[in-house]
Amino acid sequence: MRRSLLFCGALLASLCAWAEPAQVRLLSSDFVLPGKHQRLAGWAREAGVELRGLRLGIGEAPPGDWLDGGDLLILDTPRPTDRAQVEQALGERLQGGTQPWIRVGGGPPGFGDLPAALGGRLVGYYANGGEANLRRLFEAVRRWHAGLPVDALPAPQPLAQAGFYHPDAPAPFAGLADYLAWGASRWASDAPRIAFLIPRGAIADAQTGAIDELLRRSERHGQAPLAVWFDDSDPEALRKSFAGADVQALVNLQHLQNGPARRAEFLALDVPVLQTLGYRDGNEADWLAAASGVAPRTAAAFLGMPETWGMSDPLVISALENGEPKLMAGQAEALLDKLDRLLRLRRLPAADKHLALMFWNHPEGEKNVAASHLNVPASLARLGEALRAAGYRVATSDESALIDTAQRLLGGYYRPQTLDALYRDGLAASLPLDAYLHWFEALPADLREEMRARWGDPRRHWALRDIDGQRRFVFPAARLGNLLLLPQPPRAGRPGEAYHDSAVPPDHLYLAVYQFVREGFGADALIHFGTHGTQEWLPGKDRGLAVGDYPLRALGDLPVFYPYIQDNVGEAIQARRRGRAVTV
């Protein structure tokens, strides 16, 4: 009788253990997005496991009783700094030998207070990631908790240290040849190949929604996207990944490491490298409303360092939605449009390229063709010679002639009554008012009202003239073959006003001139000549600009090259981050 009671008691205890779900605690830094916690909690629940997650900010620690009742603690620490932060927050809580745990990221993986075979299996599931592995992790925990064997489950599926990804492929590819063979039926044979550098963690975390949409948009632009992850520690990672691929441009989508090695590889590849960022402090509406599109705490890592490695034109392309990165359509299209323009610039023969060059008038003065410590006329003459030698169709003009031309052009802004004579002499260009109004009326209502409130109705602008029965903006500009030479228009109606003002909207004529450069003249690239102009100082976010901000509306997707004095690092940052420029 006593033996029967003992058996029943043991059976009851076993059944109770089975009835109570295994308890998993997931602890990470706040670098790990909440969407991962939510997704893992859902998969755990489907396996009969309860997961409670906690994301720690710097200096935070889990509540004293948070670990109580946990059967397994998972430490998710992607970077060494995350690992140090989480381990410091835990203190000596793991030293007692009673809390089973695994740790992945920020260094070699590890586990404690678990049988070696089980600990290695759980680490393998979590470290390699992906939905199949992570679901098996929770099934393994459920079985272990219930006293059932775990080794009958499939072993962890390894995720290679390098590979190629596409959302429509059945699985990632270990090498480029297999990926290109798979994509041969998707892309035109001459589709430009664009490398997208993605984090391995996005694949492991099954957090690829924003990447998936970007790759599909890239294909709609006629591009062949090569989404690759690689081992940062390998100094030849990109060379090995893209050997024989004829990659035309690179787009960085991750927190890139090993900068010196990547810089050397970028130089060897000799293609444009564009930087992208994600906004982690809210959704798209929050980002649009923010004065800074990139938080100060991330500016050094995601703006400053990448610039020193050769990346340019940083664009914020995603924000958080329900804890997951979500692509912002307008920003993504701005990135892809810029890629299209860069690809066109690379493919066009030099003789067919049209370049626009803007020079400055600061400090103001009708005869002042100036830039900081730059002899502008002499430099223009030398640039013209170099362009002709490279095959560009640029008319010959010596320094003296360039001085005369540039000063006459400036006179059109100081004495608007001379515009008619300049136009007759071929020293002015024009844009139909209707073309400007078509562009202007497509602006958001708040921008239109802001400009009207400050500058009035564009139909009454002083630069309008009747030409062949049509109202047109007229402004100084000289054609030197396929090079358009023009003074940058006054950003606030009159020369010298509001040069660094980041609150006053630009004048209608200012935007009309840039529209002409983009659409009327059809420039393939724009040269902002010397230190410095005003476009990069227009109102908008201080960094991480939206395509709706004035600086980007003026430029559109034009590639910009900006010879800049080397000792003015601070203002050159504005040219790169707000002027979409490659500084020279």
Annotate the PLM regions.
Residues C8, A19-V584:
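An N-terminal assembly and electron-transfer interface module characteristic of large anaerobic redox
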Residues S14-A17:
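N-terminal signal peptide c-region/cleavage motif recognized by signal peptidases
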Residues M1-C8:
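Bacterial N-terminal signal peptides that target proteins for export
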